[in-house]
A protein has these predicted regions:
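A fold-wide structural signal in alpha/beta-hydrolase
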Residues: 42, 66-76
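Local beta-strand N-terminus motif with an aromatic residue
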Residues: 40-41, 144
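Active-site glycine-rich loops that stabilize anionic/oxyanionic intermediates
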Residues: 40, 46-52, 127
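Active-site-proximal cap/loop segments of hydrolase catalytic domains
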Residues: 74-179
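Short strand->helix junction
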Residues: 33, 51-52, 80, 93
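Non-catalytic accessory segments flanking enzyme active sites
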Residues: 1-38, 52, 56-63, 67-68, ...
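Short coil/turn segments at beta-strand junctions that form active-site/ligand-binding loops
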Residues: 38-40, 119-120
């Protein structure tokens, strides 16, 4: 990437206490010289499904945002498997709400700790992470200026009720069988 120098960026791992007392890891990246004074814009990403661990990685589009003063946060919420199998179990089926509240609690903590201005927070997720975006838009709409939901999986019950849809029966372990 022309002009990219990794020395210009800082990565950080912080832990946020969720409303039920569980510690949720968050990976952050921002441009060197960033002032943690509560004025920056934040793009927070989440997935939290299928036991998929979301490892931090390089993205040229993220660098463009960092160069404009944004903070990027990857919330390692329950439903993934970053903290082991129980982390996954604690974010699926009847525990799915933990995925959503973890994400919201991460947002609250990052704003409170000065990583972002309360009115400059954007949330992003796709596919099953799109379900997360749908949930937070209903549970905490005032906390996000923008919510981007790519190819969202938002009608879980209807999908799980139709066994003729490809892959539906394979998804029962994640979402349950509503019949």
């Amino acid at each position: 990437v022309p002009g990219y120098d990794p020395a210009n960026y800082v990565t950080e791992r912080v832990w946020v206490t969720a409303r039920d007392g569980v510690k949720v890891p968050v990976s952050l990246v921002y441009r060197k010289g960033f002032a943690k004074n509560g004025t920056a814009a934040l793009l927070q990403y989440g997935y939290g499904s299928y036991g998929a661990s979301m490892d931090p990685g390089f993205s040229v589009t993220t660098v463009s945002l960092l160069d404009r003063g944004m903070v990027y946060a990857l919330a390692h919420i329950r439903g993934g498997q970053e903290m082991g199998r129980q982390w996954y179990e604690d974010g699926k089926l009847l525990n799915k709400r933990n995925t959503f509240t973890d994400f919201i609690d991460v947002t609250d903590a990052l704003v409170q700790q000065g990583y972002a201005a309360q009115d400059r927070v954007a949330a992003y997720g796709g596919s099953a992470g799109g379900l997360l975006m749908g949930a937070i838009s209903n549970m905490a709409p005032d906390k996000y200026r923008v919510i981007l939901s790519q190819v969202p999986f938002v009608d879980v019950v209807t999908t799980m009720l139709d066994a003729s849809i490809p892959l539906t029966t394979n998804e029962y372990d994640e979402w349950g069988n509503p019949e």
